[in-house]
From Swiss-Prot:
Expression tissues: Expressed in adult heart, brain, liver, kidney, testis, and in various embryonic tissues, but not in adult spleen, lung or skeletal muscle.
Source organism per UniProt: Mus musculus
Omega-N-methylarginine: modified positions: 70
Biological processes, Gene Ontology terms: cellular response to mechanical stimulus; hyaluronan metabolic process; mRNA processing; PML body organization; positive regulation of RNA splicing; positive regulation of translational initiation; ribosome hibernation; RNA splicing
Annotated GO MF terms: hyaluronic acid binding; ribosome binding; RNA binding; SUMO binding; translation elongation factor binding
Sorted UniProt keywords: Coiled coil, Cytoplasm, Isopeptide bond, Methylation, mRNA processing, mRNA splicing, Nucleus, Phosphoprotein, RNA-binding, Transcription, Transcription regulation, Translation regulation, Ubl conjugation
Gene Ontology cellular component terms for the protein in this record: Cajal body; cytoplasm; cytoplasmic stress granule; Gemini of Cajal bodies; nuclear speck; nucleolus; nucleus; sarcomere
Domain notes: The C-terminal region is necessary for nucleus and cytoplasmic localization. The N-terminal region is necessary for nucleus and nuclear bodies localization. Regions containing Arg-Gly-Gly repeats (RGG/RXR-box) may be preferentially methylated by PRMT1.
Upper taxonomic lineage: Eukaryota, Metazoa, Chordata, Craniata, Vertebrata
Entry comment on modification after translation: Phosphorylated by phorbol 12-myristate 13-acetate (PMA)-activated PKC isoforms at Thr-352 and Thr-373.
Protein name: Intracellular hyaluronan-binding protein 4
Length: 411
């Protein structure tokens, strides 16, 4: 056990347990060398806070006394010493804080400025040179343009026009007046509740609207022409018919019946003139048919092919002589005889009949005969006798169709 504990592996394991163990109290060994009393630290902090309060009161009293000397500075401030500092020189940080507090006060254009500082010109002011005094003169514009104000060339010339013209629109500031505004719509931040850009586009005459068209609106009811449009589509609705209107139309008063009777005579004359026009329109309509009907129509209109077929001669020439009469009575038997009548003549030295040709009895080598010498699966090859075999001739006689014994069912 001692050897196991004294080994470097065990020492490293113990060190890892101590280093990476979950210790709740002071895990990282902080403030172990701090032997100071926390109560002493609290007392020093309280004493320091009281000193700061006393110093602040002294500074306020010195500032009040300095203000009574007609805005003049106290000798302590002029010499660079802070009052109540106990003879300590003013640090650079305190000087920066005093300069920042002085810059935050609102200074008038004609107010006194520190001798070593220059006020930077504000936005909208022009800085010029005065020949009489030789100092910088700040000229402030009497009328400054608003941030988002849009003034094209025409509006600058007509500056005396009343401002009520642009009451509905929000002014737009354009830095590059030669180039048209990008994008679609009116000025940025317009009345967004009315679509892209709102109605502010119409007030600017020089505004490039990038092809946007302003349509004129007519005060009319969209339901006034509804019946005429729907009748063009055959009915009060697109899926209705012309007869559906009679069901939905209100009954006409009795006073109009006399007028209808008078107009009926003229309508009859017009209808008689329109009848031939309707017939012409029906003829002009495209005739619809199925695929089978179209195919039949094409076959009827298609020209039939005509072939020049030469007929065989059935007459027997007069000079023909019969050499011998046929032994067969039927033409079918004659055709079979003609097929069998082709006999090939053999030469005298033909030896094909003496050769033995066996297609189905070829010698087959044993399995694995090539690997038998290497210890494979093969067997030793048997010696086969390839000598001449006895000739077995089997002659099949074809049945005779004229013999009822060969075909008893046909008898």
């Amino acid at each position: 056990m001692k050897g196991a504990l004294g080994s470097p592996v065990a020492a490293a394991g113990a060190a890892m347990q101590e280093t990476f163990g979950c210790v709740v109290a002071n895990r990282f060994h902080q403030l172990l060398d701090d032997e100071s009393d926390p109560f002493d630290i609290l007392r020093e902090a309280e004493h320091r806070r009281q000193q700061q309060l006393q110093r602040k009161r002294r500074d306020e009293a010195a500032a009040a006394s300095g203000a009574g000397h007609r805005g003049g500075r106290s000798p302590a401030v002029a010499s660079g010493h802070r009052p109540g500092a106990g003879g300590r020189r003013e640090s650079q940080k305190e000087r920066k804080s005093l300069a920042a507090s002085g810059a935050q006060q609102p200074d008038s254009p004609g107010g006194p400025q520190p001798p070593g500082q220059k006020r930077t010109p504000r936005r909208g002011e022009q800085q010029g040179w005065n020949d009489n005094r030789g100092t910088d003169v700040v000229l402030e514009r009497a009328e400054r343009r608003s941030y988002r104000e849009y003034r094209p060339y025409e509006t600058e010339r007509q500056a005396d026009l009343p401002v009520e013209k642009f009451t509905d629109e929000k002014p737009v500031d354009r830095f590059d007046r030669d180039r048209p505004l990008r994008g679609r719509g009116g000025p940025r931040g317009g009345l967004r509740s009315r679509g892209r850009g709102g109605p502010g586009n119409r007030a600017f005459d020089s505004f490039d609207q990038r092809g946007k068209r302003d349509f004129e609106r007519y005060s009319s009811n969209d339901k006034t022409n509804r019946m005429e449009d729907s009748m063009g589509g055959c009915g009060i609705r697109p899926w209705g018919s012309g007869k559906d209107t009679s069901d939905t139309e209100p009954p006409a008063p009795m006073e109009e019946t006399s007028m209808m009777e008078e107009c009926q005579g003229t309508l009859d004359e017009e209808s008689a003139a329109k009848v031939p026009e309707l017939e012409v329109e029906e003829e002009n309509q495209v005739q619809e048919m199925t695929l089978d009907e179209w195919k039949n129509l094409q076959e009827q209109t298609r020209p039939k092919p005509e072939f020049n077929i030469r007929k065989p001669e059935s007459t027997v020439p007069s000079k023909a002589v019969v050499i011998h009469k046929s032994r067969y009575r039927d033409d079918m038997v004659k055709e079979d005889y003609e097929d069998e009548s082709h006999v090939f003549r053999k030469a005298a030295n033909d030896i094909t009949s003496q050769l033995e040709i066996n297609f189905g009895n070829l010698p087959r080598p044993g399995r694995g005969a090539r690997g038998s010498t290497r210890g494979g699966r093969g067997r030793m090859r048997r010696t086969e006798n390839y000598g001449p075999r006895a000739e077995v001739v089997t002659q099949d006689v074809a049945p005779n169709p004229d013999d009822p014994e060969d075909f008893p069912a046909l008898a």
